[in-house]
Amino acid sequence: MTSGSVFFYILIFGKYFSHGGGQDVKCSLGYFPCGNITKCLPQLLHCNGVDDCGNQADEDNCGDNNGWSLQFDKYFASYYKMTSQYPFEAETPECLVGSVPVQCLCQGLELDCDETNLRAVPSVSSNVTAMSLQWNLIRKLPPDCFKNYHDLQKLYLQNNKITSISIYAFRGLNSLTKLYLSHNRITFLKPGVFEDLHRLEWLIIEDNHLSRISPPTFYGLNSLILLVLMNNVLTRLPDKPLCQHMPRLHWLDLEGNHIHNLRNLTFISCSNLTVLVMRKNKINHLNENTFAPLQKLDELDLGSNKIENLPPLIFKDLKELSQLNLSYNPIQKIQANQFDYLVKLKSLSLEGIEISNIQQRMFRPLMNLSHIYFKKFQYCGYAPHVRSCKPNTDGISSLENLLASIIQRVFVWVVSAVTCFGNIFVICMRPYIRSENKLYAMSIISLCCADCLMGIYLFVIGGFDLKFRGEYNKHAQLWMESTHCQLVGSLAILSTEVSVLLLTFLTLEKYICIVYPFRCVRPGKCRTITVLILIWITGFIVAFIPLSNKEFFKNYYGTNGVCFPLHSEDTESIGAQIYSVAIFLGINLAAFIIIVFSYGSMFYSVHQSAITATEIRNQVKKEMILAKRFFFIVFTDALCWIPIFVVKFLSLLQVEIPGTITSWVVIFILPINSALNPILYTLTTRPFKEMIHRFWYNYRQRKSMDSKGQKTYAPSFIWVEMWPLQEMPPELMKPDLFTYPCEMSLISQSTRLNSYS
């Protein structure tokens, strides 16, 4: 063996081993190699816009160029590159067409008469090869209007007002390859109208008013490759072979029509068809053999129709299919073996479809699948062998984390801690406070308990976020369908509804006692306890009803990772949507309106009673303090509920709401009331401040006595709360004299300003 031969073999084997070192890297299921290095990354780190491999390999080949785009590049681009239609165009830019209309432009053998208000086809010399008559006023094409243009190859008639075309209108156009009739008013094409167009390859008739077509319509189109009938009003396709006179047809686009069903005979002669687009029609039924003749089909687009059921073997003959779009159909169930025959499938779109029976078995046979699109990113866990799975997030969660944003992951703990601490602090203080108004104290404790549940809800969400950190996608679907998620979601609704009802109850109490001090009805202890119990029972009923009937409410709380049913899902039943609207735009909106109206009336009433006061300056100061307190109470309610009302209202109008909105609302906006209620209703009130001062004074006195070695008996830690009256003569300070706020308000209406100062 010569040295040259040895060098040749070394070179060949060197390249082989070098290549194999990267391509033969074996990664476990759900992981994919980083090009030519021995490193594997999980599915969620591929095609995420970040160079996680270090050599950009995880971001290479992320574009989905399968289906029509690949077919276009493969056939049309290469074909027209090889067959240049205008070899003289660059060499002869001057006009070579004789008798050109004054308003038209000419270059070489191309004529441009766009937007020249032409009402008929102009008469020019017969050597023209391209004629553009767009944006004119042409209403009809009479017989033989193009008969002299034997060399015409491109004809543009878009955006005219064409309503009728004579059967002989295109007679003589033996060289025509592209015909554009888009954006006109054509309602019918007579059979044989294209009879002389034997070389026509592109026929574009989109955005017209065609209501029916038949095989004879396309008689003579032996060379047709592309037929576009988008956005017409076709209601059905013929039950005869559609491609009978179009044997070379590769691309058929019927998007945006009103087609209801597809017949078995329609595509029986379309054996060369590679792209079939049927999206945005009204197809509700498919026969098992509908696509059987289309054995060369590369892309099938059935998105945005009304298909509810897929026959089990409907795709069995589509062995060459590389792209399938079934998105946004109300498909009830997908068979486990639905895609078994699509061995070459590379792109699968299932967006907008709730796959209740999803399982890995559905996608396991699709070994060439590189792109898959779901309604929920949680479904990506059922296709771990697919490199690119979308969506990566729902705005709330991501493939890695239950809470996608680092800000949310931090603040869920901060907000929950503040909420729980504030409310527990107030609850724990109550046993040490001797209050003359026990009923009000009871209501405040009840409110704190409800608000504390919101903090517990956020703690649980934060805890599960920690538990699933870095691998949430593996657990996402099970988590949202779990009992834990259902209970956590119901806990949030329980907290929300009880808090809303209690705030309304407390507000109405204040309203009656201040606005109608001499007519207020005293409910008494028994009635107050009954009201509080009824509020909690109502909250429990509202929160747990969705758990009682799964068939009616479906997965009511499990529509997102935070288990909060803020906005409607497409898959929700009508009853569940009505129920959700009744809560947020019924109970809560009514309560918010009552609170705003009541506080406005209270302030107005106090302001009116202060007009006759002698100490005007003092009254103005007290009114300002009162106004500030009322403002902050109403403002926090508005800050919490107005965004929620807006989101719910928009979802009712079917406006698409980003998932990020839901997560920010749940973590930052919804807990506002729960976190601030202890501050507004307890910690900033005058009795609390006086109690703190008294406690501090007693503490300093005791410390002073102890330092002098004297024994002292300091008064016990007491907070005497007089709500809404907080300044009373000593002779009226008797436990049995005033037991309810309304009675105290009878003494003097002018002293009401002290209630909130």
From Swiss-Prot:
Protein keywords: Calcium, Cell membrane, Disulfide bond, G-protein coupled receptor, Glycoprotein, Leucine-rich repeat, Membrane, Metal-binding, Receptor, Repeat, Transducer, Transmembrane, Transmembrane helix
Give the protein's biological function. Receptor for relaxins. The activity of this receptor is mediated by G proteins leading to stimulation of adenylate cyclase and an increase of cAMP. Binding of the ligand may also activate a tyrosine kinase pathway that inhibits the activity of a phosphodiesterase that degrades cAMP.
* An example Gene Ontology biological process: lung connective tissue development
Pinpoint the LRRNT domain residues.
Answer: 91-127
MF term (GO), any: metal ion binding
Q: How is the protein disposed in the membrane?
A: Multi-pass membrane protein
Q: Which residues are glycosylated?
A: N36, N127, N264, N272, N325, N368
Check the record and name the InterPro entries matching this protein: GPCR_Rhodpsn, GPCR_Rhodpsn_7TM, LDL_receptor-like_sf, LDLR_class-A_CS, LDrepeatLR_classA_rpt, Leu-rich_rpt, Leu-rich_rpt_typical-subtyp, LRR_dom_sf
Q: Per its record, how is this protein called by name? A: Relaxin receptor 1
What is the protein's quaternary organization? Answer: Interacts with C1QTNF8.
Q: What is the lineage of its organism?
A: Eukaryota, Metazoa, Chordata, Craniata, Vertebrata
Query: What PANTHER family does the database record attribute to this sequence?
Result: GLYCOPROTEIN HORMONE RECEPTOR (PTHR24372), RELAXIN RECEPTOR 1 (PTHR24372:SF68)
- Spans within the Extracellular topological domain: 1-409, 465-486, 549-577, 651
Where found in the cell?
Answer: Cell membrane
User: Which positions does UniProt annotate for Ca(2+) binding?
Assistant: L45, N48, V50, D52, D58, E59
What protein family is recorded?
Belongs to the G-protein coupled receptor 1 family.
- Which is a Pfam family this sequence falls into? 7tm_1
Occurrences of domain LDL-receptor class A (ranges): 26-63
Annotated LRR repeat ranges: 151-172, 175-196, 199-220, 223-244, 248-269, 272-293, 296-317, 320-341, 344-365
Tell me the tissue specificity: Expressed in the brain, kidney, testis, placenta, uterus, ovary, adrenal, prostate, skin and heart. Not detected in spleen.
